[in-house]
Amino acid sequence: TLSFVPGIEKLVRLIGAPVVTARIQNADRVYPRWAQKVRKGRVHFEFDPPVQFERKTPPEEILAYIRERTTLTPENSRNWPVTGKNLALGLTNIVYACPSCGGLESLVEDKSKIACTACERAWELDTSNQLNSLDGGTSLTVTEAMHKAQARFAQTWLQDTARYEAEGIIMESEPLSLMDQSDVDGVEIATGRLQLTETELRMIDSETQWSLPLSDLRLVSVEMTRKLWLTTQDKVFEPIMPKESVLKWLHAIQHWKAAAES
C-alpha cells in the first residue's frame, strides 16, 4: 500500500460525502508496479459499504478507518495462481541496488532472473514476487530487496562520493532526451546527460542549455512506472531515461531538495 496523500482525512470531513473503501486482491502478482506486461491470473475487487463521517469526527479517526480498510497485509490478503514469462523485466527500476553488495545500478535483467555485475550474485523471480537465490545466497521478497536498495542509497545519497567531493556532482545520468510535457504533445527540448547538484538540475553534453533550480520544483513524481516528472509552477519536464532507475532519481531529488530547504 502506498502512502496516503497528506490531508485526505481533512478533505473527507470537509466534503461530507460518504466514503467507500476498497481493496484489490492479487493485483501485486498480476501486475506488479515494475512489470512491463500483465501476467495471467485473477484480480479480485472488494468494496465496503459507504460510511458517513460527521463534521465533528476527529481527523485521526477518519484516517485510521481509511488506512485499516484499504491496507492489505499477509493476514487479510488473498492470492490466486499467476502465470507469466520474463517476470524480472523492469525490476531494476525499483531494485536499483544489489541486495547483496549494495552496488548501485549493478543488476542486470535476463527474462525472469537478475544478476549483479559487481558481486556476481544471482536470483530468479517467481510469480509470488519472491527472489530465489541461484547460488546459495539469501532469498528475499521484491519488497525486501527494494527496501535494501533504498537503505543502501540513503547512506550517502550520492552516485560517486569522490566525484561529489571534487566537483559537487551528486548524480549524472545516462544519455537521455529531455521533454517538455506541459502540453498534450510533448516537445523535446534537449539531449545529453542530466546532472544533479545541491542546488539544481542541469543538462550537459547538450547543444541546448537547460537548468532548473531545485527551489523552483513544486513536485517530483514517477507516473506510469517509468515517467519521471519534474513539475514547476507552469511547466512539466520529463527526462526520458532508457535504462536507468527513475525511482533512484526520484529519491535523490526529493532528498536534496528537502536538504536545500532545511
Question: Whereabouts are the PLM-identified features?
Answer:
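Non-catalytic C-terminal accessory region of glycerolipid acyltransferases
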Residues: 1-178, 196, 219-224, 228-262
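Phosphoinositide-dependent membrane-docking surfaces
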Residues: 194-227
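Short, surface-exposed beta-strand/loop "edge" segments at domain boundaries and coil↔beta transitions
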Residues: 187, 208-211, 234-241
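Non-catalytic terminal regions of proteins
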Residues: 175-195, 202
